[in-house]
Every structure is written in C-alpha cells, then in structure tokens.
C-alpha cells in the first residue's frame, strides 16, 4: 500500500468518502441512478478486502519479529486474532488520528513497547462505551453527512462496513469501567492494561519529583551544613556575656590564620570555624540588642543597619542580609514578617521584636542631622569670607604664578568662577595674584603635574597632626546625611555608611599586613554584599562626592603609612615585590569590579582617578626605595665618598651656575654657597670624633632645599635641579672622573626623592594647609641643620609607640609597626660589620617576616 492510501492520509482528504466536507457536498447532489450506487459499493468492497490483506501481513510480520510480546501483549501464540471484515470495521473506527494517536501517543513512544514502532494497526484505549461485545461486530456507519441515496445503498449491503468519518474537533473521551474492558477481546485488553500501567508510572514519577525539589530547597536554607541550628543557638546563649570586642578579635584572628594556612584540609576547617564565629557574633549582638515585644513592629533593614554599624566599629566584615535574616529566625522563631507602608514605599517589618533604645537612637539621629546642617552652613559662610579676603589680598601682589614658591593645584588650567560650591574650594597658594575656586571636588585633588613644597613634610606626617589621615587612628568617614536627597531612606543610608566603612578598613588592613589576595578580592566582596536598594543609593549622583571623600581619606592614610618605607633600605625583596604587584594590578582589579557592578561612567572615572593617583605615588615610592638602596651603600663608603669629593672639587661651579642657571644675584650667591660649601661638607669623610651623616640626614637636607629659594616655583625648581646635576655629571665624565658612576647613582636617587617629596606635599596640602600658613606668616621654622636632623628623627619612634595600638600578631608584617632601617640615635657609618649586625637585629625583632 502506498503512502497515499494509508488511513491517515485518507482521513486528511486522500479519498472523497473520508472527507466530511466533500461528503456534505455530495449529500446535496441528488442520486442519478442505481449504476453509480453499485459502482460505489464495489469500490468500497475492494478497498475493505485490500485493508484486510494488509492487516494480515502486518500480523505475520509482527509474529515473525524478535520483539513479539508473547506474554505481555498476547496471552499465547494461538491467541493472535485474525481479522475478519467485521474486525476491519472495528479497526477503521478507532484508527483515526483524532481518537487513537491522541490517547496512546505516550505509550507508543515508551521504551516498554518498542514493537509499536513497527507499521501495524494502532488501537484506542478508551473505547468501552462505543464498542459492543466480541460477538457483535456489526456497526451502523450511517452519518448525517451522507446523502439519502448513499444511505439507501448502504442499507442494502450491511455486510460491507465503511469507516465512520470523525469530526474535526478533538473531544475528551470518557473514562470507562473495568467491566466494559473485560468484554473486549484479549488483544485489546492487553493493549489497554499496558497503556494504563505506563500512564500510572508517569503519574507516579511526576508526583514523586515535585516534593523532592522542595526538600532540596529547604536543605539549602539551613544556616550551616556542619553545625545545627539548635547547637548554634545554645552556643550563642552561652556566649551572650562575652564582650563583642573579644568575639570580633577572635574572628579577625581566624581570618588571618586562614590566609597563612597552606594545607587545604586545615584551611577548610578554618573557614568553617570562621563562618561559625561570624554567625555567633551576630547572634550575640541580637541577644544583647533586641527584645521580644508582642506589639512591636520594626523595619527589617533597620536591624541589619544597626548590626552592620557594630561590625564597622569592630572592623569586622558583616554577613549578608539573607544570612542575617536566618539568624534572626533561629533566635526568634515565633516572630512574623509583614510588608507594611504606603503603596510604592512599603518595607518588610519584623512583628514581635524591637531594638533596645531605638527611640533614643532616632532622636539622636535627628539631632545629629540638624547639627550637620548647621555646621555646613557655618562652613559655607566662613569659606566665602576667606575666599573674598584672600582674593583681595592676592590682587595686590606682583609675582607671576609660575615664579611663586607655591602653585595652584586646580585640575583646570583656566581659572574657574570665583565661588562655586561652598565645601569644595581649591587650596590657593600664598603670594599668588589670583584665586581660582574649583567647580567640584574632582578638581581639588592634585594630579601628578601639580606639586607643592611643604617644609618638614615627613616630620609632620610622622607626628600627630591631621588626625583624619593619621594611619594610627581609626578611619572616620564624613557624614552621609548632607549628601542624601529628601526622600532617601535613612536606614539604607546607615547600612551603606557602615558597609563602606568596613570596605575602606578592609583595604587599609590588607595593605598594612601585605595580604594581596584579600586586597584584590575586597572590591568584588563589597559589590556582592550590597543589596539592590543599597546599590541604587551607592551609585546615585548625589553620593558620588561623598564616595570620593571617603576614598581620598583611605588613600591618604595608605600613603602616609607607606611613606615610612622611603628610607627603610633593608626592606626585604619579597615585600618590595608585593608593592610592585599592588601597583601593577590595583587599577585593573578595581576597573573590572566597577564594570561588573554596572555603575555609571562618571562614577567609574571618579573611582579610577583617585586610584590612579595612589598608584602613581606608590610607583614613585618604589623608585625611591630602589634607587636609595645603592645610594646608601655609596654614601656610607668612605672610599666612594673620597672619590666623589675629588671629582666635585675639580668642577667650575661658578661658571656652571652662570651658564646653566639664569637667576638673580641673591640666588646665585646662595646656590654657589650650597654647591661649594655645604655639599662638600656633607659628602666628605668625617674624622673619628665626628659623626657621619645618615641617609635620613641626606634626605632631610635635600627635601628642605626648596625653602632656600622661596620665589621659585616647585615644578621649576625640580627641572632646574635636574638640569644642574646633569651638567655637573657631564663635566665629570668629560674630565675622566673616577667617581662618575657613584655620582650618577646618587643623582638618580636625588631626582626621585625630590619628586616624591613634592608629590606627597601636593597630596596632603589640604590637611597641612593651616600648619603651612602658620609657618609662612608667623612661626616659620628655619631649615634644619645637620646637627638638628637626628634630634628631629629621634621623636618619630616615640610617636609610633604612643599611637600604635594594633597587635603585630595579626599578620606576618605590619607596615605601621615594622622598621626596616637603622634607628637615627644609634646610627653609625655604613660599614660591612655594622650592616651585618643590623641585619641580625632586624631578623630577630621581626617574627615570621620571611615566612
């Protein structure tokens, strides 16, 4: 049989007798005579005989195949039926696509019945009401779609059954009882039982998988996989009397131990213990800060904001909001959570719990906000008065900006408006004719090309001045409330303030203890802990300036801490390599985290601008250390200093100054005295009774040279000093001096150290501008002499002992407490035995420095 003669194709219109639409059309045409009726009967009889033969062939192939289900589909081989014409009529009725394929499609595709893939007749399963008993296979195939003449011809030949055309719409067949199924032949009963079994299996599988998924979700919501909720709750109840500071110290100790542990098993145990201690810290705080109250209602984010604030005060990273909510449910399982508030401004609230002293905290918050507004208004008035008075005084000057001793640090080369924003005036140097106010805080930060000379800069940085950037003091961020909009949520703002404080402290601590992995991962950790409302507030335009101020405070503390390393010439190469890795990967890591967080372009540029300035200063410090190490060996070697002195005495200093340094007579005299007298006295070999200068003496003398020329601009001084040294080295080289190599190494260090001191001065000019103004106007300090420099340097260790409060046990290295150089009051001329003794003391005093 061809594909066009299959029952499916005939039902789709392959034959006119199986097309209901054509049958309806033929019913409207009157009969033309008995000849046409007889021809139609003969064609139907031939067609039914052909189908009967085809069915016999299918059964024969079915019996010969290896997949014959002798025990499943048929009771025995003798029970395979032979189809008569009546059976063929039954087959035609239930083999249409609408009745059979719709109901047993799943069974035909099941792996339990692969023999159904063979081309054999397919039978329906739900057929009880339309099927008579096995002995009655006479069906009435009359249809309302068949015409009158056609129905008369069918009544004359009832033994000739023809298929009944099915309607075009699908109908749900009714469910049949087991009694009606038993009246069917065994073959059909077998097919029905197999279909019912496969359907039951599918239904049971569907019913089983759904509860399992829910159980997995419930397991994932457990607090910890190793410690049960009851054990954690009992541990928190027993630890409720322990101070939070002790718990926080234990968590930080575990965090530091996990960074130094190399074994994977021990590291995993440390991590699990650390997470347990962090959860314990949160639960102890909940027990001490929250009380049960049946009528109390409090916003859920307010409790989390107070918890994050406590973590920030103890310099501890908080858990995520979801994990904190689980801790609340463990301690207080009977409280409920409801969403309350106006439409569009509703929040989730805890019902049945309250914060102790929350009313007093809210009143203090309102008073603090009013105080901040009052202080900002007073600051605006004072800065406006200072700007007007300074601008009027500066107009009386006659010097040019490029010739003054101080330069403007505004990013914009062209002057901006006289007054822009009250809290962002750029620092204006003294004795400049014009005052330019920057448009925003972005312009206030000095770039690499804006430098400033501050007398006794590093002495001031090592003292207690400018506590906001003092690395020994905790980081205090500016208030966030003046930068909030009117409709901002203060609980979310408090959460952001505390989270960012923790973030800034974590970066500073990672650099302090040289934990590079923690430093680079802190950016992504901060982005992951921010919820959607906090992230939205964090990236708003109004808070960009607050974020910039916070980052600027952090970078100032970091540079102030790193400035101690400028003369610590015994720093190990491992730590120097780590500083290089930070300088190389800091910008890349920060930019990647900002791009992944999908913040605005202006926000990204602001963050990267500050980070780039920090990296530039760090690179300059690395160059100072690298050039200072060989320079210190030369300046502490008597033979090298004798050779350098002999070559220097051969130079025509007065001729070089007149040719290379165009300046007035006073500056020529001062410069001649410095090069012919002070430099020679500084590098010549001392007698046994005299104390040789140290590297700190050389550094302080060089950094205070610009104070001898107050009219020269800082950048101009740097260029002229480099040009003068280059000319002197060229003359030494042309004369064949043996000390050319030593002078070249020392000259490289002088260039780097001068640039470093000027860049650091420009970076901290806002913090030290009041002290600089006092020095310039009232109590200007004289340039330190060689005899007074060691006394100045002696005060630094005392200050560090008073302000240093951190424990050295938290890390292998502490940049605040560790010293890599000789003490100034016990410094001796650099010789090989002295160096060996100092290195021995260095390795003895610093525990685990080189792991």
From Swiss-Prot:
Keywords: DNA damage, DNA-binding, Nucleus, Repressor, Transcription, Transcription regulation, Virulence
Composition bias type Low complexity, residue spans: 54-84, 141-170, 783-797
Cellular compartment(s): Nucleus
Molecular-function GO term, any one: RNA polymerase II cis-regulatory region sequence-specific DNA binding
Compositionally biased tracts (Basic and acidic residues): 38-53
DNA damage recorded as keyword: yes
Record PROSITE patterns: RFX_DBD
Region (Disordered): 1-121, 134-170, 195-230, 368-411, 783-806
DNA-binding region, residue range(s): 282-357
Protein origin, superkingdom: Eukaryota
Pfam families the UniProt entry points to: BCD_RFX, RFX_DNA_binding
SUPFAM superfamilies: Winged helix' DNA-binding domain
InterPro entries found in the cross-reference section: DNA-bd_RFX (IPR003150), RFX-like (IPR039779), WH-like_DNA-bd_sf (IPR036388), WH_DNA-bd_sf (IPR036390)
Induction / repression: Induced during biofilm formation.
Chain intervals with Polar residues compositional bias: 1-11, 20-34, 85-114, 199-211, 384-393
GO biological process assignments: DNA damage response; negative regulation of cell adhesion; regulation of transcription by RNA polymerase II
A GO term from the CC aspect: nucleus
Family: Belongs to the RFX family.
Function noted in UniProt: Transcription factor involved in DNA damage responses, morphogenesis, and virulence.
Protein name, per record: Transcriptional regulator RFX1
Native species: Candida albicans (strain SC5314 / ATCC MYA-2876) (Yeast)
Lineage: Eukaryota, Fungi, Dikarya, Ascomycota, Saccharomycotina
